[in-house]
């Protein structure tokens, strides 16, 4: 616990500066949007509510006893890693795109699609993969890491935590190179703002190459949930306690990117630890909270269940998901399995709220 605390504390010490610089780049993106281009925003701390607060609440339950503090430390580690990803993908990777968009405006050839293409190429180049769209894979195909459908129907292994750290380091180096090139063309922007972004990129190099791998050794020695732990999780759920989860997918990106794989692996580690330590053995109340109240953890459980062929997968556009509750009930009745609903396309708030209320029981 002390080692985890020292690692996360050192990263948290510089996070405030990263947030400030990231917000500055988001402002640049909004200004470009006003000129007619696509909008790019940065979701800062998007897992704060889903992970940190939820795990903090769980840590206060008497059933957890002295293990509560460990959960708090793990939640902080998740939050730090979440922010590292946010700044990499939503800030650093956009600098070159902003430069390209400005160039297209300067020479009179407006091409907003350049953003989408760059975004997709960036994701694909660094290990992005599509989520399962059809059958649950054979367990023999999934040993050694999470799996994904790459769009061709073939099942591919998702990156491990160590591989993810390596990818982040590579992305940091390429992101800095892109930034250096863009700096020459972006001299009309505030030098102070650009200096701040440069500091952010450099910080990424340090964080991705050091902190992510340190967290691996100190927090997550084995990120794969074993079949016995998975069976314990699912067998302890009441028949009317449905482990549904709704995932909203950005249509301009691949369905589930590398970060989802790593967070899913970490969540499975947390659950496996809870099961193996005996914490959840006799506590249906805590098990119900983990499976139904903590959205991020439910997503990890769902992926584990898919690996073991214990969950159905449903995808659809906004028009199709208005009947999602009926479809989910039908699949659940036919298969007797929980259902993961993965929604694609743009989702309006009303539809999102309705589906969440109906399917996330």
Swiss-Prot record:
The keyword Oxidoreductase applies. One of its GO terms (biological process) is hydrogen peroxide catabolic process. InterPro entries: Haem_peroxidase. Keywords: Glycoprotein, Hydrogen peroxide, Oxidoreductase, Peroxidase, Secreted. One of its GO terms (molecular function) is lactoperoxidase activity. Its main location: secreted. It is found in: Secreted. Its EC number is 1.11.1.7. Coiled coil: none annotated. Partially N-glycosylated. Belongs to the peroxidase family. This is Peroxidase A. The lineage of its organism: Eukaryota, Viridiplantae, Streptophyta, Embryophyta, Tracheophyta.
